[in-house]
């Protein structure tokens, strides 16, 4: 009897998460900074938060990720104190936040719109929260300059806020939030208004800023790549519930359900039939792939409404080869149906031979290949071989 294949390993390609820098202390060794225990929220008859249980650690960069309307911003606003809750408990730094107003909580928030006052200077915007601070005017001015330096705007204090670019306004909003030295910084889709290049630049700057100040950052985003790049951990939310809470690599490589897998990046799905298995694997039959042993660590749950079991794999987990070429691992053949060029990467959509055996529908899989200068790109209609490893497959059952 052949040994079960090795579990799926985190992929090398999908994110720039390595930019988080050197290894950080384990999260389990840090105290809880935010705790949500059975948090419920209703808007009339609409159940926006359905018993959220969540712990966010001190100094963690944490993301709430999900589609529009999933409850992520509502959850952030309950932590900030802008929304009350209809059940459960929210604690910040061990203190129950019931009846604690937003302006007294040890949190501060950067809004999606930045909420910059256009008629004020940059310095006046950043120092707005210090109006009742007992420090002298000179001390406040020094604090403002320090905050501007922290976000890369040293010397910008005298500029008019309305004349700033989108990226500069975002930095001003960050400086204004951090000048009050909160224990938690809450970020409500702060990069969504920026163009792609500026957004990617600000992702790196936020990572560095969080590492510099060392406080807890909680980011709300609908952008999967943004969450994967920036976060220590991510909570994926659907319909007021947390579907999976994990680190970026685990979330991408071992999604807890087909819905999570489909939401995070690109995944190919094929119908499967369960044939048996053992303690360390499940044996499935997949049209075009044959009989495959899936490692137990790669078995996830299906979702309500799924037609039946299916297997999934990421585009980079397979290799495209010319017809007749020798290949390592298991091999399936097919015909290229579409070629999509992305500069450094090309995606090939391949209709797999025999993939219509179960449901009468020819199934297409997407394979990604790094572009190499001088290498010939196969055309639509070309017969190819697809090489893959059983350890790269996830079973949803």
Each model region followed by its residue ranges:
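Non-catalytic connector elements of ABC transporters
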Residues: 2-17, 21-22, 267, 277-397
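ABC ATPase nucleotide-binding domain
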Residues: 55, 91, 385-387
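ABC ATPase nucleotide-binding domains
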Residues: 61, 102-262
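The feature captures the beta-strand-to-loop junction immediately N-terminal to the Walker
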Residues: 65-67
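Helix-to-loop junction immediately C-terminal to a conserved catalytic motif
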Residues: 80
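Conserved coupling/switch loops of ABC nucleotide-binding domains, chiefly the family-specific signature
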Residues: 86-89, 239, 271
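Conserved ABC transporter NBD signature motif
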Residues: 88-96
């Amino acid at each position: 009897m052949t040994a079960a294949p090795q579990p799926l390993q985190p992929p090398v390609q999908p994110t720039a998460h390595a930019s988080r820098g050197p290894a950080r202390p384990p999260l389990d060794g840090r105290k809880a900074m935010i705790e949500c225990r059975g948090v419920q929220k209703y808007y009339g008859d609409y159940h926006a938060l359905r018993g959220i249980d969540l712990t966010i650690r001190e100094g963690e960069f944490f993301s709430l990720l999900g589609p529009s309307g999933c409850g992520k911003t509502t959850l952030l606003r309950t932590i900030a104190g802008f929304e009350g809750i209809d059940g459960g408990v929210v604690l910040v730094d061990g203190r129950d936040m019931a009846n604690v107003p937003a302006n007294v909580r040890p949190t501060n928030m950067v809004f999606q719109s930045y909420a910059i006052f256009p008629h004020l200077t940059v310095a006046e915007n950043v120092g707005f929260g210090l109006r009742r601070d007992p420090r002298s005017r000179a001390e406040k001015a020094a604090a403002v300059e320090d905050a501007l330096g922290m976000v890369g705007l040293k010397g910008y204090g005298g500029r008019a806020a309305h004349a700033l670019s989108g990226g500069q306004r975002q930095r001003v909003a960050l400086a204004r939030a951090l000048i009050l030295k909160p224990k938690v910084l809450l970020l409500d889709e702060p990069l969504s208004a920026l163009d792609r290049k500026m957004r990617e630049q600000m992702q790196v700057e936020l990572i560095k800023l969080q590492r510099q100040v060392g406080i807890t950052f909680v980011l709300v985003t609908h952008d999967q790549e943004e969450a994967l790049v920036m976060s220590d951990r991510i909570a994926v939310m659907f319909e007021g519930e947390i579907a999976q809470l994990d680190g970026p690599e685990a979330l991408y490589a071992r999604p807890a359900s087909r819905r999570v897998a489909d939401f995070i990046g690109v995944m190919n799905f094929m119908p499967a039939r369960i044939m048996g298995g053992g303690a360390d694997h499940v044996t499935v039959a997949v049209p075009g792939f044959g009989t495959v042993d899936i490692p137990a660590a790669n078995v996830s749950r299906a979702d309500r409404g799924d037609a039946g079991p299916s297997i999934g794999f990421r585009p980079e987990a397979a290799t495209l080869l010319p017809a007749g070429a020798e290949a390592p691992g298991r091999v399936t053949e097919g015909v290229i149906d579409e070629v999509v060029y992305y500069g450094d990467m090309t995606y090939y959509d391949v209709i797999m031979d025999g993939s219509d055996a179960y449901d009468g529908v020819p199934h297409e899989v997407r394979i990604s290949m790094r572009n190499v200068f001088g290498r010939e790109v196969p055309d639509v209609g070309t017969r190819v071989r697809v090489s893959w490893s059983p350890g790269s497959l996830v079973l949803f059952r």
